């Protein structure tokens, strides 16, 4: 079916191109429509939700309901699913609809909420027949997804389908295609037969000119006037210009304009003449016969509540129907002729006649405009307004459709009738509510549909009338919102007419508001309206039109067209409305269109116009709030200059201050701890430490510090060595027993406890060693001097290389101390550090006790070196960067330390790793020094706390 329809629509679209541009325009639209036809068939066949038809039929079909479930879930079917289920753009990779209930985007269409367990289509198709599923899911999904094409499709098709959608839609589609191929009139009755249920009103309206249908007859009653007038006006002139066949469509075109505007595309038999009509005077007759016809059909069926309110309303539309048929037909002639015809199909046929008929129709359009204006301004503006509000969409769409297969026209006409009626009724309500502000949106909504039809015509018409309608660019842009850029010119024109006529249209819309009720009471209202209410409404709208004046006639015609056509349209519209899905879809689209059309119109106006229009609609509170906000901004801007600081700068400032304070604290704390941790020699050394902080930290090397401060450090450390060697040797022997170097890394981490204890002794050693090693390089070295004092007995001995009890530690330490002193210290120290501290001051006290003397001294050197060294390493690190020596020692120490400190105790973790690498990386010498001090402080604190405990 879809291929058949597609081929038909392809042929139709080619025909459409030959027959009218509207089809070619619709080739995208019509193509989506013919696809919609094919899709509706597909949906009937495969119950395809739009994305679903793309999914593999074999697995997606009920054949594998559970396989499909597997697809729902991540099963092996995932392979199938990926190609077929398109992930939603925003869904991420969630093939199973679990995260996105859409499965792969299209897996579960967003528009349908169905549990993942059963295929959205499948699960529903299981419960539903494809037909049912196709109408409502499709209208549901399509109304959501492609409001226009799919809404047109789904509503038109689904509404048509709802009554006799498949037979009618398919028959009307097929017949329309065939009828388009063959005489549409003959097949039109068959279509009417096929489409009798839903299309009966439409085809009646549609056949209104032919008086094929009851409504056609009813419409024909008003329409004879319309026909007479239409024939007299551009439509008649067009019809006169056109072949009699076209002329009869022209007669219909009044009727079509009024009632058949939608139908007439569907009575494509007449729109067939209407395409010939359109052919001869491409849109004059096609637009009057097809556009007007469509105006009637579209407005009639579509616009039961629409401007082409049924023939009866256009019995006064008698003026108006010709106005609509003629003027609108002329407008659409101009539009279609300008647009290249309602469609290329019409355009092709029409181009044969168009050059005659087009000019004629354009002339007639002008003539009709003049006539209609003479006739109360019920002319071109009126017809346009009748037609244009809808005809821009609908009427033009109708010639468009008239060119297109009647089947499509039917579907589309039904849909668009419903859509347009719904839109127009909605818009009429909203127009009445918002009157002028919203009327244009209504028109926009209608122009959206019309613009679809007219899109083809709009392009040429845009060319022709773009100059005219430039003022309608806002309307154009609404239509753009209607997604009908091509249709914009026509829509613009419609909007101009709508805008110009919008006031009249307001009255028309207000008159039309009941027709929203008609939507509810569609058949009854349509029947009544088609006979008596249409005259009443026709009188109302005619009075309104007459009151409105020439241009107002455009909108009055629009209103009347709506109202008159509302009567006719209400049947098919009621079919749609009778269907909750169609009604909801239409309402949804109408609301969306109205909202967006207003927005878009305002969006594309100049900011001042936009503001004015927006303000005009604002409540006083809104205006007041806006005023206050404006004042606040003004005052702030002019009277409260910002400091010019960015938030980043402001918070960075706070961070810097905090860092400085912390740095100061860290500097102080190591010193304080040193004093606390260290004996008088420590205080001496601490004084040295300050000096060292000043000079040695900058001096960069522990080795430098050692050598610089060695005299001092040795002096201080000698005393401490004497004191601490004994302590440290005792402690160290007990602690050295631990193979600190072997267990150093684990011990490093764990040894801070032991290190703390050991640090107590080491601090003495360190101070000695620091002095031996002259760790004047930094306060860290000083802090580590307290460690060094402990280590320094060892290190001093190492330096002294006296082979006393510390020889082992010296050897081990010295091996590393040499490098450390030489600048290789860092790594030796690292090992020592990790091992030394790690050797288990607290944690590895057992090991320390075992190997404590040699290892301890070694460890203490390393540890003392490393804690001490770590600060110095930082300092050396930083200073090495500064001094250049540090690069070697820094590389060996700082880096080694940086890597090693992690192995060390907590001290290394927080401080040494942080301070050597981090300080260097941060290139904050102060921070490095600070951290050195901190590390020294921590070491000393640990040592002090542990020293007493160790001692």
Swiss-Prot record:
Residues 14-51, 121-143, 759-772 have a biased composition (Basic residues). Residues 2-190 are annotated as: Required for mRNA splicing activation. Keywords: Acetylation, Activator, ATP-binding, Biological rhythms, Isopeptide bond, Methylation, mRNA processing, mRNA splicing, Nucleotide-binding, Nucleus, Phosphoprotein, Receptor, Transcription, Transcription regulation, Ubl conjugation. It is found in: Nucleus; Nucleus, Nucleoplasm; Nucleus speckle. One of its GO terms (cellular component) is nucleus. Residues 1-13, 82-94, 157-166, 305-322, 548-558, 776-786, 844-854 have a biased composition (Low complexity). The modification Asymmetric dimethylarginine is found at residues 66, 101, 108, 841. Residues 266-276 have a biased composition (Pro residues). Pfam families: THRAP3_BCLAF1. It comes from Rattus norvegicus. This is Thyroid hormone receptor-associated protein 3. Residues 926-936 have a biased composition (Acidic residues). There is a cross-link at residues 202, 384, 448 (Glycyl lysine isopeptide (Lys-Gly) (interchain with G-Cter in SUMO1)). Residues 204-220, 228-241 have a biased composition (Polar residues). Belongs to the BCLAF1/THRAP3 family. Its main location: nucleus. It comes from the Eukaryota. The modification Dimethylated arginine is found at residue 17. The modification N6-methyllysine is found at residue 252. Residues 359-951 are annotated as: Required for mRNA decay activity. The keyword Transcription applies. Residues 1-94, 117-558, 659-951 are annotated as: Disordered. GO terms for molecular function: ATP binding; DNA binding; nuclear thyroid hormone receptor binding; phosphoprotein binding; RNA polymerase II cis-regulatory region sequence-specific DNA binding; transcription coactivator activity; transcription coregulator activity. The modification Phosphoserine is found at residues 220, 233, 238, 240, 243, 248, 253, 257, 315, 320, 326, 339, 379, 403, 405, 466, 532, 557, 559, 572, 616, 619, 669, 679, 681, 695, 860, 924, 935. ATP binds at residues 549-556.
């Amino acid at each position: 079916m879809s291929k058949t329809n597609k081929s038909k629509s392809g042929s139709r679209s080619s025909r459409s191109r030959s027959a009218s541009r509207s089809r070619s325009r619709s080739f995208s639209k019509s193509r989506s429509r013919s696809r919609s036809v094919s899709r509706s068939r597909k949906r009937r066949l495969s119950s395809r939700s739009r994305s679903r038809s793309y999914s593999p039929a074999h697995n997606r079909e009920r054949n594998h309901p559970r396989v499909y479930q597997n697809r729902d879930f991540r099963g092996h079917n995932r392979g199938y699913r990926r190609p077929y289920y398109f992930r939603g753009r925003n869904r991420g990779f969630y093939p199973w609809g679990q995260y996105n209930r859409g499965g792969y985007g299209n897996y579960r269409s967003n528009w349908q909420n169905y549990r993942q367990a059963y295929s959205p289509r499948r699960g529903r198709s299981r419960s539903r027949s494809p037909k049912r599923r196709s109408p409502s899911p499709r209208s549901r999904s399509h109304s959501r997804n492609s409001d226009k094409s799919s809404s047109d499709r789904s509503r038109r098709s689904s509404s048509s389908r709802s009554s006799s959608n498949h037979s009618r839609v398919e028959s009307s589609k097929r017949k329309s295609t065939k009828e388009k191929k063959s005489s549409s009139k003959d097949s039109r009755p068959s279509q009417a037969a096929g489409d009798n249920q839903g299309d009966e009103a439409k085809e009646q309206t549609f056949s209104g000119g032919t008086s094929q249908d009851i409504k056609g007859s009813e419409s024909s009653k008003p329409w004879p006037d319309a026909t007479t007038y239409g024939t007299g006006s551009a439509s008649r002139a067009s019809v006169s210009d056109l072949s009699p066949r076209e002329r009869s469509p022209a007669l219909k075109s009044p009727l079509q304009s009024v009632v058949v505007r939608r139908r007439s595309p569907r009575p494509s038999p007449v729109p067939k003449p209407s395409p010939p009509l359109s052919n001869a005077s491409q849109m004059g007759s096609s637009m009057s016969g097809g556009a007007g016809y469509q105006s009637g059909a579209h407005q009639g069926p579509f616009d039961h509540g629409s401007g082409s309110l049924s023939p009866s309303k256009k019995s006064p539309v008698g003026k108006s129907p010709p106005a609509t048929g003629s003027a609108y037909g002329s407008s659409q002639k101009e539009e279609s002729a300008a647009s290249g015809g309602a469609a290329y199909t019409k355009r092709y046929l029409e181009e044969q006649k168009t050059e005659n008929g087009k000019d004629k129709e354009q002339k007639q359009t002008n003539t009709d405009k003049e006539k209609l204006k003479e006739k109360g301004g019920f002319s071109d503006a009126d017809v346009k307004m009748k037609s244009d509000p809808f005809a821009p969409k609908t009427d033009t769409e109708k010639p468009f459709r008239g060119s297109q297969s009647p089947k499509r026209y039917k579907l589309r006409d039904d849909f668009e009738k419903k859509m347009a009626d719904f839109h127009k009724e909605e818009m009429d309500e909203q127009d009445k509510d918002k009157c002028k502000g919203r009327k244009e949106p209504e028109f926009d909504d209608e122009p959206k549909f019309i613009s679809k039809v007219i899109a083809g015509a709009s392009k040429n018409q845009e060319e022709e009338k773009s100059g005219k309608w430039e003022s309608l660019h806002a309307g154009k842009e609404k239509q753009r919102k209607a997604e009908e850029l091509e249709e914009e010119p026509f829509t613009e024109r419609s909007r101009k007419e709508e805008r110009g006529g919008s006031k009249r249209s307001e009255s028309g819309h207000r008159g039309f508001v009941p027709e929203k009720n008609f939507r509810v009471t569609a058949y009854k209202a349509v029947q009544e309206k088609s006979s008596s209410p249409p005259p009443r409404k026709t009188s109302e709208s005619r009075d309104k039109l007459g009151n409105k004046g020439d241009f107002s006639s455009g909108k009055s015609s629009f209103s009347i067209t709506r109202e008159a056509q509302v009567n006719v349209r209400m049947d098919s519209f009621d079919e749609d409305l009778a269907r909750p899905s169609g009604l909801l879809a239409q309402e949804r689209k109408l609301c969306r269109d109205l909202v967006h059309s207003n927005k878009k119109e305002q969006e594309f106006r100049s900011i001042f116009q936009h503001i004015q229009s927006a303000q005009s609609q604002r409540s006083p509170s809104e205006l007041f709030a806006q005023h206050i906000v404006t004042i606040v901004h003004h005052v702030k801007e002019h009277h409260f200059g910002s400091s010019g600081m960015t938030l980043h700068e402001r918070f960075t400032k706070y961070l810097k201050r905090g860092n400085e304070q912390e740095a100061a604290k860290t500097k102080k704390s190591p010193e304080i701890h040193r004093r606390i941790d260290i004996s008088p020699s420590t205080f001496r050394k601490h004084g040295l430490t300050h000096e060292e902080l000043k000079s040695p930290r900058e001096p960069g090397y522990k080795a430098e510090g050692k050598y610089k401060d060695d005299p001092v450090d040795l002096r201080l450390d000698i005393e401490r060595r004497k004191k601490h060697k004994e302590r440290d040797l005792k402690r160290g022997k007990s602690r050295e027993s631990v193979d600190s170097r072997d267990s150093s890394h684990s011990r490093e981490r764990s040894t801070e406890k032991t290190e703390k204890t050991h640090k107590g002794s080491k601090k003495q050693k360190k101070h000695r060693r620091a002095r031996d090693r002259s760790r004047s390089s930094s306060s860290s070295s000083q802090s580590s001097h307290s460690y060094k004092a402990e280590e320094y007995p060892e290190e001093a001995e190492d330096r002294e290389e006296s082979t006393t009890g510390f020889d082992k530690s010296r050897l081990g330490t010295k091996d590393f101390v040499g490098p450390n002193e030489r600048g290789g210290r860092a790594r030796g120290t690292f090992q020592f550090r990790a091992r030394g501290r790690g050797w288990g001051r607290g944690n590895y006290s057992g090991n320390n006790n075992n190997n404590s003397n040699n290892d301890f001294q070694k460890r203490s050197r390393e540890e003392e070196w490393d804690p001490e060294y770590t600060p110095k390493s930082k300092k050396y690190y930083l200073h090495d960067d500064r001094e250049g020596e540090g690069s070697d020692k820094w590389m060996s120490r700082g880096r080694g330390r940086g890597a090693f400190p992690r192995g060390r105790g907590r001290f290394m973790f927080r401080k040494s790793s942080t301070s050597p690498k981090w300080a260097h990386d941060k290139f904050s010498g102060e921070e490095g020094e600070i951290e050195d001090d901190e590390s020294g402080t921590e070491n000393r604190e640990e040592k002090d706390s542990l020293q007493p405990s160790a001692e």
